[in-house]
C-alpha cells in the first residue's frame, strides 16, 4: 500500500477508501461463516510466518518513539515481542472459534393474526477505528469486524505506522486466500493527521460507527467532532476498594495485579480505596507491597501516616489516569464511602471490591455505575479476550448499544424479519 504525501490528495483518497469499504461491507455481510473462518485461519498463519517482518517494522517504530522521548508506558504499549506476535495470532484463532453473530435469531414470536416475527443480528456496516500506539489493535479490530460481517477502516497512530502496515499485510493475505474483498480491512496509508478529521465527518454516509482507541485527547476529540455514533471510553480512572472484611493475601494479589501487571492499559487501577477499619492491618501492608513493586503511591494524610515514602496526593490525582506505575490511595468510611468517591471521581469504566462479606460485595456491584464491576478479581480482567469475546475492539462506557468490552456480537445491530401468509392490516 503506497502512502501519499500531498494533502490535496487526501480527500480524494479517503473518499475512495470509504466507497470501497462500503462495497466490501455488502459482500462481507453475506459471506458464510465458513468463508470468514477460512480467512481468519489464513490470517493467523500469515502473522506467524511474517513475525520477523512485523518485529523488524516494530523495532523501527520503537526506536523512533524512544528517540522522540516517549514514556516507558507508551513504549510498552507500542512494543511487540515474539510472544506478543504469537499472542496476536492466537487471538485471531480464538475469534475464529467464537460463534458467528450474523444471522442469529435472538427472539421469535407469533402474533394473533398468524404472522411470525424474528429479531435477527446483522452487521453495522463500515466501522472506522482510530487508534494510537498499540499495533495489536490493527489485528484485533480487523478480525472482529470480519467475524461480525463489517468492513473496517483502520487509522493507526503515526508512531505505530510501520508495525500496522506489516500486520495489515497479513490480514489482507487472509482475505485474499478466502476470496473476500481486500477492502474489507483497509488501513489508511498515510500519517497525515487530516485523515482523522475526514473520518470523523462520516465520509458522506460512508461510515456507520467510529471506535477510538487511545489517550484522553484523542477520545475527547472524537466524541466532540464525530458526526456518526461512537463506541468509546474517555479514560480509565479505575478503583480497587479493599473492604475491612477482605482477606489480606487476596487483597495484595488483586491490588498488585490491578496496578502493576501492565500499568499502561486502560484496565489498570489508578486509585486504591481502603476501609478505615483496615488502616493498620490492611492499608499498611498494601502500601508497602506497592512501593516494593516499584509503584509510586500518592495518598491522603491517613495513607501518608502508614509509610513515610507516600507522597501527598493533590486534588487532581483522584481524577487522573496515570498510565504508569503510580497509584493514588485514600482511606474511606466503608463501602458507602468508596461508592461515593467512585461516583465523584470515577470514569464508569472498571471498578473492583475485595471483601469476604457477600452483602457488602452485592451493594458495591449494584450501586457502582461502571461498565465493569468485579468482586475479588483484578481490574485487568477488563478485556474482551478475558470475557470470552475472543478479543475486543475497545471498551465502551456509554449506555447506548454497546457497553463494556466491544466484541463481535457488540459490532452487530438487528433487524426484524416478518413472515406472513397474506395478512393485511384492517
UniProtKB/Swiss-Prot annotation:
One Pfam family here: Aldedh
Disulfide bond positions: none
Molecular function GO labels: glutamate-5-semialdehyde dehydrogenase activity; NADP binding
Subcellular locations according to the entry: Cytoplasm
This enzyme's EC code(s): 1.2.1.41
Pathway per the UniProt entry: Amino-acid biosynthesis; L-proline biosynthesis; L-glutamate 5-semialdehyde from L-glutamate: step 2/2
Coiled-coil region: none
GO cellular component: cytoplasm
GO biological process, one term: L-proline biosynthetic process
Catalytic activity reported: L-glutamate 5-semialdehyde + phosphate + NADP(+) = L-glutamyl 5-phosphate + NADPH + H(+)
Domain of life: Bacteria
Name of the top EC class for this enzyme: oxidoreductase
Keywords assigned by UniProt, alphabetized: Amino-acid biosynthesis, Cytoplasm, NADP, Oxidoreductase, Proline biosynthesis
Function summary: Catalyzes the NADPH-dependent reduction of L-glutamate 5-phosphate into L-glutamate 5-semialdehyde and phosphate. The product spontaneously undergoes cyclization to form 1-pyrroline-5-carboxylate.
HAMAP family: ProA
Family in the record: Belongs to the gamma-glutamyl phosphate reductase family.
Name this protein carries in UniProt: Gamma-glutamyl phosphate reductase
Source species of the chain: Nitrobacter winogradskyi (strain ATCC 25391 / DSM 10237 / CIP 104748 / NCIMB 11846 / Nb-255)
